[in-house]
């Protein structure tokens, strides 16, 4: 689960976010979220392709230029789950991930920058507050929807 907090927003800026959130229908809606500070790999990776791996694998054979670092997020082309890299890897080899694969991978490109998380709101009810200078404060809790 992630808590996402927005800085104080003008009514115009807040209204765009609020209308999107209420249109999700609470926890029933699924949308794409790319968290600032986490959506891009910290390593030097410029290309990465996975081999075919079975459900349950935690070591994925990859052909890679550059490096992925512990804590980087990745997504395989074959499904929507996002995984975290658990050990640094430079160049091609066995990439350690968490959790174990929930679906088999295909021999395809691995997304390591601008990683899209498929998420849902954790509650059907959302709140905001309006503070001084008509600035709106809003936070939401989301969870990966896979």
Where are these regions (language model features)?
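Extracellular/virion structural assembly segments
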Residues: 1-146
